[in-house]
Structures are given as structure tokens and as C-alpha cells.
């Protein structure tokens, strides 16, 4: 069913409450301070080769944090972290050590037959029994963990796609897969407290060819106080998995195929003979979120957060261009945050400051797993119960293939998932000020790209805070050195930023904050 967009926007304008239908001339005045020329100035610095791709924990990211802090200071933003613009994010890097794996009398080779994702705690042990849990799914319609106590056990599961019977998922009952992808299964298994997880990946060989250098480098995790160390994970080939299961007289793929054909779990303890040593090298990592505050007036205790991640993926060893500059991802969003900070501080200086306070938040660690925003959401500088909205900007400087003939667009994700008020405000501000084509393709919970889970707004939404994610879509230079400043459409970067500005202006100045009144149809667990 198609919506009549004109009627919908008119209805939204009538329903949003105390905001006038006509343009707010004061808002327009300060929105016009967001320019393509200023955007170019900031992005040319942040996405320069000097910043070496801004990888979290590396000198380029530290330089970016210093630049953003200096901009906030020059604008006169309040430094909200005990007089600083920097919030330390406690990260550690866990790099794989010289791990070994032997099953029976056969020794297997690291980064050929298996690879490890290590924990902060080394694991060296002889294993006489593993608990085979099939696909590792724990769903009310298909529960392979029912009745199992996995705490302290060694668990073996397959990362193969969930079982389908007669072309239909045994979980959804349709041709569409459930949310139980391999990452969700692993997180759920980790929550059960096993001593070690052995993960069979049928694509191990191709993954090693494609990602060998990445898999041999360290991964970053939050070093949360009082958090128990997660189990190490050994990802193994079919040959290794079959050797572990040798006493069952069955291969791992025949066992999972039997589960798929019957639609019934077949979890069981299996006797085996495994000797393994999973070793790691742990080191502390320097990383910071950067934030500055424009304090509100009569509603200053309520906070609107405008965010973007300033980190990217750093350097590459391949090709002649070694720097993944990340001009669009997410230099463009960080630039948008800086531009809006300038516009709001100019308004405040001239007596038109916002009623609610606005926190401009540039986070680190997004490319490592949304780590900076996760830390902020769990250790907030301002109470989450007083945080009324998060407007998150991640990639707003390019045009994707779908819109090559109409660049005047932006994807919006999440505006209607927690608050009907926020969605109406968003529709109204666009219709009144920027008139971009709003594309809601990625707002569908069934969209396979799962964009909703892939940027920092997620860590606010999971705490029940209404969010909007602004995004230009994926393009051919995504996560490549060719994501350069020269390819940015600065006219569109500025226009999309103005949409976020006008939305923030409305939220910050209205009598009542957006009410949480919608049950989110995106599952909470990504």
C-alpha cells in the first residue's frame, strides 16, 4: 500500500503541536550558517592523509580528536567532562598469540585449519567432552539449548545458515530467515558462560584468504569493570570439526543436515580428545569520545544528542594508496556535527539559544563495534532518562547508485520506531525547510542489510531513547582508500546537515519532548 505523501506531510504538520506551519525565520537564519564551504574546510582536514584513516587507538584518531576538541573550544562550547571535551573510553586490544590445536594424534595449523578470537584470559586444556549444539539457536520455536547448562563447558556449533524445511525457515515459517544470524548465536552462547566455544565455519578457507591480515591483528573490546571475561572462540574447518566428532561416526554437516531435515534439535554431549592452547596478547588502547555542550534555557536539564563517529578503518597494506581516508564514512557526519555546533552557538550568542541543551558527540570505535557510543550509553555524562532524542549522522556526503539521477535525497532509519512524535517532527521539518526525498528503504526490519544495527544510534535506541539515523547509502568506495574528499558532494552534505539542524532546532525548542509511544519492531538484540 502506497502512502499519499502530500496528504501525510500535511497531516504531520497539523499534528506536531506548537510548531508553526510556516518556516521559522530565526531557524532559517542560523541554518544558513551551515555551508558547503565550511564543510569542505573541516573535511579536508579530517580526511587528509595526515590523519591516516583515523583508526581507533592509532595516532590519526588522536589527531582527529584533538581537531574536534579544538573546534568545540573555539566555538565556546561547554566542556562537559569535568572541564574537558574528552571522555576516556577504556579499550583493550586482544591480539592472537601462538595458539595450537590437536585432535587425537592430528595436529592442525593455525590460520590454515583454524583461527582464534582470543579472550583476556588464556585457555590451555585437554578436552575430553564437547557439547554439540547444532546451529546454536535458542528460539521459542526452535531451541537447541533447552535443558543445557553450558557454564564452564566446551561448546561446538555450526555457523551454517539456520535450517529451512521445504524452503521455509523453521523459525519464521516463511522464506525469510530469522534474526538468528551467526553473530547473534555467538553472543547468545557467550552469555551462557562456556569455557571455550568451537565454531565450525564452512567458509573458513575463503575467509582466511580474504581476511588473513585482519584476523591476525588484534580486536578491540571495552574493558568494563566487573565484567567477566568472555570465552575464547576457535573457528575451525570441516576437517577439524569432523575430527572432534569422530566418535559419533558422523560428520558435522551430516549432523546439521539431519537437524534441518527433521526440524528438531539434536544437541548432545560428545566424547572427544582435544588438546588446545588459545593464547592472546592484551594491551591497553588510548581512545576518547569528544563532546561539547550548548546549554539550554528553561529546559536545560533535557538533552538532545547530535552524534557522528569520527573514527574510520585506518591504513591498508594493499595497493599504492595506503590510506582509507573515510571522507564519507564518517568524516561527512563528523563535519555535520561541527557545522551544527557552529550554527547553534551562533544562535545562542545572539540571544536565540535552544531551550533544551544540545550535546554534540563525536564518538570513537564505531568501526570496531559501536564501542564509543556503547560506552557513552552505559557511562553517560548526562542522565539517559533526561536524554530526549539522538540524531545520528553516518555518511551524508555521497550519492548511492539508486539515486544517481536524483541526488536530492537521504535515507532515514528509526524515526518511527520509538516515537510517533519524532517521526511527525522529522517529516514536518523536511517538508518545511529542506524538501529532500526521504527514502525509508532501510527502515524495514526485514531489510537484509540490517542498517539499523550498524551505527551509533543503536546504543541509544536500545535504552529506549528515540533516534533518527541519517545516511546516504553504500557506494563503490565504501571502506576503500578511494573514499576521498574529491568525491564528496558538498552541496548535499550541507543540505542533509541542515535537515538534521532544523529537526534538532524543533526538538530543542518545543514545549514537550517526543514521547516514547511505539513498540519497536526491530529486535533489540543485533
What are these regions (language model features)?
Residues 108-109, 231-236, 241-250, 363-469:
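Metal-dependent peptidase/peptidase-like ectodomains
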Residues 25-33, 49-59, 74, 87, ...:
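Second-shell loop/turn segments in exported
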Residues 335, 342, 475-526:
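His/Asp/Glu-rich mid-to-C-terminal helical/loop segments that flank catalytic regions of hydrolases
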Residues 31-51, 56-80, 153-177, 288-361:
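Catalytic-core environment of secreted peptidases
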Amino acid at each position: 500500500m502506497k502512502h499519499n505523501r502530500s496528504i501525510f506531510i500535511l497531516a504531520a504538520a497539523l499534528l506536531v503541536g506548537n510548531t508553526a506551519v510556516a518556516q521559522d525565520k530565526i531557524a532559517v537564519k542560523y541554518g544558513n550558517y551551515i555551508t558547503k564551504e565550511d564543510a569542505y574546510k573541516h573535511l579536508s582536514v579530517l580526511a587528509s592523509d595526515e590523519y591516516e584513516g583515523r583508526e581507533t587507538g592509532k595516532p590519526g584518531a588522536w589527531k582527529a580528536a584533538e581537531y574536534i576538541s579544538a573546534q568545540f573550544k573555539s566555538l565556546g562550547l561547554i566542556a562537559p567532562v569535568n572541564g574537558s571535551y574528552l571522555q576516556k573510553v577504556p579499550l583493550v586490544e586482544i591480539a592472537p598469540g601462538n595458539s595450537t590445536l590437536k585432535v587425537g594424534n592430528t595436529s592442525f595449523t593455525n590460520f590454515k585449519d583454524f583461527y582464534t578470537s582470543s579472550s583476556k584470559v588464556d585457555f590451555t586444556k585437554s578436552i575430553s567432552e564437547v557439547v554439540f549444539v547444532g546451529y546454536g539457536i535458542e528460539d521459542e520455536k526452535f531451541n537447541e539449548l533447552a535443558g543445557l547448562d553450558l557454564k564452564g563447558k566446551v561448546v561446538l556449533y555450526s555457523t551454517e545458515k539456520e535450517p529451512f524445511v521445504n524452503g521455509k525457515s523453521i523459525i519464521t515459517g516463511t522464506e525469510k530467515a530469522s534474526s538468528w544470524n551467526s553473530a547473534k548465536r555467538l553472543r547468545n552462547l557467550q552469555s551462557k558462560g562456556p569455557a571455550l566455544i568451537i565454531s565450525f565455519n564452512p567458509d573458513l578457507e575463503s575467509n582466511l584468504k580474504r581476511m588473513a591480515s585482519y584476523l591476525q591483528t588484534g580486536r578491540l573490546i571495552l574493558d568494563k569493570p566487573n565484567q567477566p571475561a568472555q570465552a575464547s572462540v576457535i573457528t575451525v574447518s570441516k576437517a577439524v570439526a569432523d575430527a572432534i566428532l569422530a566418535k559419533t561416526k558422523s560428520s558435522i554437516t551430516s549432523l546439521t543436515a539431519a537437524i534441518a531435515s527433521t526440524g528438531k534439535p539434536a544437541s548432545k554431549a560428545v566424547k572427544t580428545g582435544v588438546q588446545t592452547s588459545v593464547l592472546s596478547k592484551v594491551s591497553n588502547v588510548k581512545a576518547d569520545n569528544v563532546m561539547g555542550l550548548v546549554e539550554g534555557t528553561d529546559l536545560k536539564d533535557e538533552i538532545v544528542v547530535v552524534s557522528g563517529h569520527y573514527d574510520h578503518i585506518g591504513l591498508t597494506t594493499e595497493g599504492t594508496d595506503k590510506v582509507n581516508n573515510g571522507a564519507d564514512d564518517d568524516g561527512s557526519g563528523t563535519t555535520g556535527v561541527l557545522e551544527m555546533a557552529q550554527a547553534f552557538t551562533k544562535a545562542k550568542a545572539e540571544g536565540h539559544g535552544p531551550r533544551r541543551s544540545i550535546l554534540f558527540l563525536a564518538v570513537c570505535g564505531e568501526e570496531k563495534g559501536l564501542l564509543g557510543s556503547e560506552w557513552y550509553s552505559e557511562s553517560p555524562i548526562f542522565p539517559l532518562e533526561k536524554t530526549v532524542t539522538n540524531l545520528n549522522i553516518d555518511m551524508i556526503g555521497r550519492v548511492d547508485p539508486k539515486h544517481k539521477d536524483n541526488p536530492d535525497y537521504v535515507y532515514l532509519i528509526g524515526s518511527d520506531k520509538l516515537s510517533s512524535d519524532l517521526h511527525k517532527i522529522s517529516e514536518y521539518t523536511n517538508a518545511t525547510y529542506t524538501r529532500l526525498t526521504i527514502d525509508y528503504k532501510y527502515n524495514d526490519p526485514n531489510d537484509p542489510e540490517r542498517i539499523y544495527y550498524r551505527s551509533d544510534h543503536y546504543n541509544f535506541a536500545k535504552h529506549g531513547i528515540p533516534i533518527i539515523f541519517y545516511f546516504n547509502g553504500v557506494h563503490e568506495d565504501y571502506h576503500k582508500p578511494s573514499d576521498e574528499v574529491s568525491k564528496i558532494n558538498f552541496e548535499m552534505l550541507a543540505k542533509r546537515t541542515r535537515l538534521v539542524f532544523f529537526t534538532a532546532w524543533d526538538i530543542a525548542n518545543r514545549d514537550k519532548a517526543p514521547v516514547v509511544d511505539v513498540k519497536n519492531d526491530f529486535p533489540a538484540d543485533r
